[in-house]
Amino acid sequence: MKFFFFSFINYKVLNDAARPWQIGFQDPATPIMEGIVNLHHDIIFFLIIIIIFVSWILFRTLFLFNSKTNPVAYNFSHGTFIELLWTLTPSLVLIGIAVPSFALLYSIDEIIDPAITIKAVGRQWYWSYEYSDYVNEENEFLAFHSYILPEEDLELGQFRLLEVDNRIIIPVNTHIRIIVTGADVIHSWAVPSLGVKCDAIPGRLNQISFFIKREGIYYGQCSEICGVNHGFMPIVIEAVSFDDYIRWVQNKILD
């Protein structure tokens, strides 16, 4: 009983990271992820109805049209109405699923007036970040590397294989653009609770955007097999208030 109680408490506090035996989504922190979760629920609704209907037809056919009940088979060559029905009905269902998914796909690719642009570079096996909107007195961009935190350096409550030495700090309620590329092999920058995943390809710049609605710490990982230490490339985003973000930028520039 204690285990389940504390698991529930941890779930409510640490709802922006994966938890043991999780089969659902992490709590959405962006409108995009909310749309993905809602689309999933809508599709599951249609899926349950289809499964129930098809199962009912299947069992009805097995019990009412077997060799004992109907020793002589009916001689049907075709049925125009039923053929139209089983062609049009799935088409309408697919259209009903496709229309909202197209709108969601379009909104994912839309870049809305980003206030902050961050460049993420995938390397074997760590991430580098560059805040190109800010420069110090020596005309250098605000930039840093982000390595996985060794297990012996973890503090109580921190996650093994998910913590880093330098987090990405961004403000809430702000349109953020991430430009993603790779320095050596193909990586993938992904944060599930934000609903973002973007391939980091050497020689190519890809971009994604998001709008975080609440403060918190969001965890992700490289999602493209990139070598022996692929599993040691975590991503940690800390969303803070705008005032805290400005203070962090000032301290970083002074450093």
Swiss-Prot record:
Annotated GO MF terms: copper ion binding; cytochrome-c oxidase activity
Pfam families: COX2, COX2_TM
Mitochondrial intermembrane side: 1-42, 105-255
Enzyme Commission identifier(s): 7.1.1.9
Mitochondrial matrix side of membrane: 64-83
InterPro entries linked to this entry: CcO_II (IPR045187), CcO_II-like_C (IPR002429), CcO_II_C (IPR034210), Copper_CuA (IPR001505), Cupredoxin (IPR008972), Cyt_c_oxidase_su2 (IPR014222), Cyt_c_oxidase_su2_TM_dom (IPR011759), Cyt_c_oxidase_su2_TM_sf (IPR036257)
Co-factor remark: Binds a dinuclear copper A center per subunit.
Principal place of residence: mitochondrion
Required cofactor(s): Cu cation
GO cellular component, one term: mitochondrial inner membrane
UniProt cross-references to CDD domains, sorted A to Z: CcO_II_C
Residues involved in Cu cation A1 binding: 187, 222, 226, 233
Localization per record: Mitochondrion inner membrane
Keyword Electron transport appears in the UniProt entry: yes
Transmembrane portions of the chain: 43-63, 84-104
Assigned keywords, A-Z: Copper, Electron transport, Magnesium, Membrane, Metal-binding, Mitochondrion, Mitochondrion inner membrane, Respiratory chain, Translocase, Transmembrane, Transmembrane helix, Transport
Assembly and binders: Component of the cytochrome c oxidase (complex IV, CIV), a multisubunit enzyme composed of a catalytic core of 3 subunits and several supernumerary subunits. The complex exists as a monomer or a dimer and forms supercomplexes (SCs) in the inner mitochondrial membrane with ubiquinol-cytochrome c oxidoreductase (cytochrome b-c1 complex, complex III, CIII).
Family membership noted in the UniProt record: Belongs to the cytochrome c oxidase subunit 2 family.
The protein's role, per its UniProt record: Component of the cytochrome c oxidase, the last enzyme in the mitochondrial electron transport chain which drives oxidative phosphorylation. The respiratory chain contains 3 multisubunit complexes succinate dehydrogenase (complex II, CII), ubiquinol-cytochrome c oxidoreductase (cytochrome b-c1 complex, complex III, CIII) and cytochrome c oxidase (complex IV, CIV), that cooperate to transfer electrons derived from NADH and succinate to molecular oxygen, creating an electrochemical gradient over the inner membrane that drives transmembrane transport and the ATP synthase.
Record protein name field: Cytochrome c oxidase subunit 2
Organism: Cyanidium caldarium
Phylogenetic placement of the source organism: Eukaryota, Rhodophyta, Bangiophyceae, Cyanidiales, Cyanidiaceae
Name of the gene encoding the protein in the UniProt record: COX2
